[in-house]
Amino acid sequence: MASLEERLTEMLAPSVEDLGYELVGVEYIRAGKHSTLRVYIDQDEGILVDDCAAVSRQVSAIMDVEDPITNEYSLEVSSPGMNRPLFKAEHYQIFAGEEVKIQLRMPIQNRRRWKGVIVSAEDEIICLNIEGREERFSLSNIQKANIVPKFDN
């Protein structure tokens, strides 16, 4: 069965794309009685506040009709930002050579948090170079992944 985030992505992507944006991904963060639905969008020209507002109105209308989340939540629409989240294998392919932090659903070698450079992403397997060793992770076991921002001095 698909996760809530996967179902929301499938439900929202066509409308977001019709507005001219890429739906990068969706995060649903549970926090007691009040949760947050975070929708990340992008386009070649970058994202402005007006873009976020337009997508927010569209997503809000869809959520009101479909009602996939029964408890209270806040809707946030934003660009991926500097510490861009990675959701799909294609994202890892695009950002090959970049440093990434990942958090796993199930630990590997008693660790849930890993940091390394993206080597490849093939057949739903993400390969990272971690301190000179290549480690492989199933995309389905990656709960969260973000690019580590580079700051030039």
Curated annotation (Swiss-Prot):
Pfam family, one: DUF150_C
InterPro entries in UniProt: Ribosome_maturation_RimP (IPR003728), RimP_C (IPR028998), RimP_C_sf (IPR036847), RimP_N (IPR028989), RimP_N_sf (IPR035956)
Cell compartments where the protein resides: Cytoplasm
Keywords attached to this entry: Cytoplasm, Ribosome biogenesis
Gene3D superfamilies: Ribosome maturation factor RimP, C-terminal domain, RimP-like superfamily, N-terminal
GO biological process: ribosomal small subunit assembly; translation
Transmembrane segments: none
A GO CC term attached to the entry: cytosol
Superkingdom: Bacteria
Cited function: Required for maturation of 30S ribosomal subunits.
PANTHER family named in the record: RIBOSOME MATURATION FACTOR RIMP
Family according to the record: Belongs to the RimP family.
Name of the protein: Ribosome maturation factor RimP
Species of the source: Psychromonas ingrahamii (strain DSM 17664 / CCUG 51855 / 37)
Organismal lineage: Bacteria, Pseudomonadati, Pseudomonadota, Gammaproteobacteria, Alteromonadales
Gene that this polypeptide is encoded by: rimP
